[in-house]
């Protein structure tokens, strides 16, 4: 479908990441017009504003697109007859956010960031020769230069998980913010919409000085009480699984780290290191989505975080001269190739929590 807003292709834009709404139960569907499924999308990214050139857009918007797919009951017939339309709502500004920061971002990785440290290490004797880097990359890639502790990617303002609950649409996306008027950080823009009237019920932002919030996902019960899950990182906080309550009266409440979801080490994945991405540029991926699922009056949430530490000696194990154990390289695994504290090339985990708002 096309959106009635200008782009470098003319007077319309293509729909960009239309996210279908989920319902908390069988009694929460919209039965109007033969059954209606709602979607939400955003239009700050180049995919919407610059579909021809693919780049050069402003990367900011004050528009939210609400889509309606009507007569969905006809899908259960031999001749489906669907109708798709959209309307644009004016909202507060959102924009493509900066990358996340974590403790040590931009500095040389020490032994607590073992993969990055290995890529810079030219003195440790290994089974591949002098220099840990030889265990991971070739000479041409190593010549790309010294690595630093990465700044994980934020999302690009595309709409994240959407709910239809209590007669309303609930959605959120990543945005740039300046918490308390300070430096720009990654934060969350959230929206509660009445799709029948095409009006905003409530909207707002979630951000905090010294922190970045990314990849939100909202789950809302049939009664209209919900939880928004996301990853929280910061100047003094390793990537952690976090959440905040949400409802249509208050909006989003105070955020907290999920029980057991505190990150304990820096993101140390291969996509954030130029030697391992060589000859392509780095793209320090941090998942594409969080998740939330409603279970009666409770909400299950899932967000990425760094669950385990892995010291340099254990990371190298028998691949270092004089090392011990039989773990696979980079896994910090136990004996007999037992489960590791991380994978060979990345160290994120997913924290799943059950909350009752």
Describe the residue ranges of each PLM region.
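C-terminal PAP-associated
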Residues: 1-357
């Amino acid at each position: 479908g096309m959106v009635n807003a200008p782009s470098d292709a003319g007077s319309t834009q293509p729909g960009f990441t239309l996210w279908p709404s989920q319902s908390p139960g069988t009694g929460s569907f919209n039965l109007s017009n033969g059954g209606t499924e709602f979607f939400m999308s955003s239009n700050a990214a180049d995919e919407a504003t610059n579909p021809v050139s693919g780049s050069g857009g402003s990367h900011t918007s004050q528009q939210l697109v609400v889509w309606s797919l009507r007569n969905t009951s006809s899908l259960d017939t031999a001749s489906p007859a669907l109708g798709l339309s959209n309307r644009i709502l004016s909202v507060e500004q959102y924009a493509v956010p900066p990358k996340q920061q974590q403790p040590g971002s931009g500095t040389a990785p020490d032994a607590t960031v073992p993969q990055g440290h290995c890529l810079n290490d030219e003195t440790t004797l290994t089974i591949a020769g002098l220099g840990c880097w030889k265990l991971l990359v070739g000479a041409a890639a190593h010549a790309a230069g010294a690595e630093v502790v990465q700044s994980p990617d934020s999302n690009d303002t595309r709409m994240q998980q959407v709910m239809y609950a209590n007669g309303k649409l609930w959605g959120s996306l990543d945005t740039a913010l300046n918490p308390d008027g300070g430096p720009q950080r990654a934060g969350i823009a959230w929206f509660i919409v009445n799709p029948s009237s095409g009006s905003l019920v409530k909207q707002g932002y979630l951000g905090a000085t010294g922190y970045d919030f990314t990849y939100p996902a909202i789950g809302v019960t049939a009664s209209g009480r919900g939880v928004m899950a996301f990853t929280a990182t910061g100047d003094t906080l390793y990537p952690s699984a976090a959440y905040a309550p949400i409802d249509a009266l208050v909006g989003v409440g105070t955020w907290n780290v999920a029980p057991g979801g505190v990150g304990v080490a820096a993101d140390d994945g291969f996509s954030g290191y130029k030697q391992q991405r060589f000859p392509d540029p780095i793209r320090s991926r941090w998942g594409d989505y969080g998740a939330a699922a409603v279970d009666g009056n409770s909400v299950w949430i899932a967000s990425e975080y760094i669950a385990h530490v892995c010291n340099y000696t254990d990371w190298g194990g028998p691949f270092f001269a004089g090392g011990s154990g039989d773990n696979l390289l980079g896994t910090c695994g136990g004996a007999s190739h037992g489960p590791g504290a991380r994978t060979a090339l990345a160290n994120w985990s997913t924290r799943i929590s059950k909350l009752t708002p």
